Amino acid sequence: MREYFKHTSSLLFGVIISIPLAIYYEISMLLANRGMEAEVRNAADVLFKRIFEGIGYDGPLAGVVMFALLFVIAAIAQGAHKEKTGIKIHWHYYPVLIAESALYAMLLFALMAISMNAMTPTLALSPIDIGYSLGAGVYEELLFRALLLSGLLFIAGKLPGKTTVWKIVAVLISALLFAGAHYIGAAGDTFSWMSFLTRSLGGLLLGFVFMFRGLGAAVYTHAIYDIYTIFL
């Protein structure tokens, strides 16, 4: 069990198991946006795509280049610490991690439902709905946890005082920014303190999942939670 937790929390494992979700998301968005003047996409995805468009890669190619770059970075990082995790990918851990993430997602769903006092489910779950949920899991976790929270945790480790306290502050900051991002732009939600606090609570849980269980668990927890909110 110790080997399972150590292996599945690695960045390389997280990047690799996020790729199938990203592929499904890209295909579903291509189908959903056929013939539309304004594309519907996850905001975090749009942000990443614009960055890569600036260096000459656009559309799905930008996603391919981004994940190739992530894979190289993760492989180098894991190779430098191979005495801890090893380079080999143990695929039999994949379904176990999905089941583990589903449990975290159910906990998140329960907490969010209690906070919101009620949930409004959508009874019809389409392949495109699933794709959008998977994309949110991948791109929002890459932005707010893999990049933002990792950066904040790095800074927290350099600050004077108790590192644990600073790490909790880092998770809180990333959670607040994650919640606030849902109200930005034309497609953003209407702000209310209840929804903001609820999303902040969700960001806290996802932050701790990322910190203790790695990118893969955070991505799948987020994606499965989004599917729960549509289906349950």
What is the predicted function of each stretch?
Residues R2-I19, I89-A102:
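Alpha-helical transmembrane segments and their helix-start/interface "positive-inside/aromatic belt" motifs
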Residues I19-E26, V64-G79, A105-L111, L176-L177:
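Hydrophobic core of alpha-helical transmembrane segments in multi-pass integral membrane proteins
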Residues L30, A113-T122, A181-A187:
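Juxtamembrane "helix-exit" motif on the non-cytosolic side of transmembrane helices
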Residues E37-I55, A118-G131, T190-M194:
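Membrane-interface interhelical loops and short amphipathic "cap" helices
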Residues Q78-G137, L153-G161:
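Juxtamembrane helix-loop-helix connectors linking adjacent transmembrane helices
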Residues S126-L232:
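Transmembrane helix-loop-helix hairpins at the membrane interface
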